[in-house]
């Protein structure tokens, strides 16, 4: 069961409460290049990204972000560190959310100015604790970046905002170490009811980063922890969105795109199942429909899996049986399997509309 958290809104996207876990990403373009950043945001939105974050290293980036926000199809969050003037500038430009740790931007009056501007516009603030940048006093107290140190850091930042009467807050606790991240979120979830942004930071490249993120986020989501997520990968941010939705789909928390089931193959397989499955996956990638498609290689599990799917192929010697809703449609030669599956999917979609 999902943990009950308060609900905030990032632009038009609800986060927390009964809202489904949303999928975020972060642009890796230079924010000062508004054209390139908007191109990437549009690509992310096309992949299903619901919230996007942009780095704001200087005033030129803050000014560009205003124009980016006005043309973005999805809510935009500004990632701010140290300089409160950058936060004020992006708030003035209509930003949908801030990622900002109030303890890192100097004197209290600076925090008060940022909070006043955020309150005026109902802009939420994400407190983002990272194991790699904990306060020196916490490192001295705990010896190294422990889960407890991360939680104490987060609560310290929360306290600053609460003292100023601001509760439009969400929190993240990220480390590249999966068990540490999981432990930190579990501890924090027992202490507060603010919505939680979950992620494994610096997770790695597409292969290793996907695995780390799937394990860490999967554990948290199965525990009911997580109101919005970002999969951090070294590479194209569009892949972060795809992986994020696949993690949610695997736990039946979100449905986006077609669910492809395919067997790993073994010595009984007598067709080029890998080639068929890869072609089917590629051709179905742009279809956002709640369907299960099975590509199975032999008579052991194939017919059963194919029958359970909306559409499926169960392979034999150079051919296979095409199933739809548990019923055999026809026998299909191996060379035509991908085309037959795609055609059947298109037929179902046409009938639904």
From Swiss-Prot:
UniProt gene name: ispG
Organism: Geobacter sulfurreducens (strain ATCC 51573 / DSM 12127 / PCA)
One Pfam family recorded for the sequence: GcpE
The name this protein goes by in its record: 4-hydroxy-3-methylbut-2-en-1-yl diphosphate synthase (flavodoxin)
Binding-site list for [4Fe-4S] cluster: 263, 266, 298, 305
Presence of the UniProt keyword Magnesium in the record: no
Catalytic activity: (2E)-4-hydroxy-3-methylbut-2-enyl diphosphate + oxidized [flavodoxin] + H2O + 2 H(+) = 2-C-methyl-D-erythritol 2,4-cyclic diphosphate + reduced [flavodoxin]
GO biological process terms on file: isopentenyl diphosphate biosynthetic process, methylerythritol 4-phosphate pathway; terpenoid biosynthetic process
Pathway where this protein functions: Isoprenoid biosynthesis; isopentenyl diphosphate biosynthesis via DXP pathway; isopentenyl diphosphate from 1-deoxy-D-xylulose 5-phosphate: step 5/6
Keywords annotated in UniProt: 4Fe-4S, Iron, Iron-sulfur, Isoprene biosynthesis, Metal-binding, Oxidoreductase
One of the record's GO molecular function terms: 4 iron, 4 sulfur cluster binding
EC code: 1.17.7.3
Family of this protein: Belongs to the IspG family.
């Amino acid at each position: 069961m999902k943990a009950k958290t308060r609900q905030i809104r990032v632009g038009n996207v609800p986060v927390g409460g009964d809202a489904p876990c949303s999928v975020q990403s972060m642009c890796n373009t230079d924010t000062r290049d508004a054209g390139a950043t908007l191109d990437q945001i549009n690509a992310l939105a096309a992949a299903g990204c619901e919230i996007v974050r942009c780095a704001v290293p200087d005033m030129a980036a803050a000014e560009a972000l205003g124009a980016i926000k006005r043309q973005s199809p999805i809510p935009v969050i500004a990632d701010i560190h140290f300089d409160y003037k950058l936060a004020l500038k992006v708030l003035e430009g209509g930003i949908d959310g801030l990622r900002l740790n109030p303890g890192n931007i100097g004197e209290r009056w600076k925090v008060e100015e940022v909070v006043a501007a955020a309150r005026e516009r109902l802009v939420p603030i994400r407190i983002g604790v990272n194991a790699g940048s904990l306060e020196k006093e916490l490192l001295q107290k705990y010896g190294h970046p422990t889960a407890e140190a991360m939680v104490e850091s987060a609560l310290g930042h929360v306290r600053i905002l609460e003292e100023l009467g601001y509760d439009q807050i969400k929190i993240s606790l990220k480390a590249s170490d999966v068990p540490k991240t999981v432990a930190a979120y579990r501890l924090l979830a027992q202490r507060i009811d603010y919505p939680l942004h979950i992620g494994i930071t610096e997770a790695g490249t597409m292969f290793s980063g996907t695995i780390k993120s799937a394990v860490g986020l999967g554990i948290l989501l199965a525990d009911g922890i997580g109101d919005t997520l970002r999969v951090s990968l070294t590479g194209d941010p569009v892949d972060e969105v795809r992986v994020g939705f696949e993690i949610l789909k695997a736990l039946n928390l979100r449905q986006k795109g077609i669910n492809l089931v395919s067997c790993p193959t073994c010595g009984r397989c007598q067709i080029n199942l890998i080639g068929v499955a890869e072609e089917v996956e590629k051709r179905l990638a742009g279809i956002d429909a709640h369907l299960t498609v099975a590509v199975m290689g032999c008579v052991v599990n194939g017919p059963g899996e194919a029958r359970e799917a909306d559409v499926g192929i169960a392979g034999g010697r150079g051919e296979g049986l095409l199933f739809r809703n548990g019923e055999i449609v026809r026998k299909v030669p191996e060379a035509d399997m991908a085309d037959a599956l795609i055609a059947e999917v298109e037929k179902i979609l046409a009938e639904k509309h």
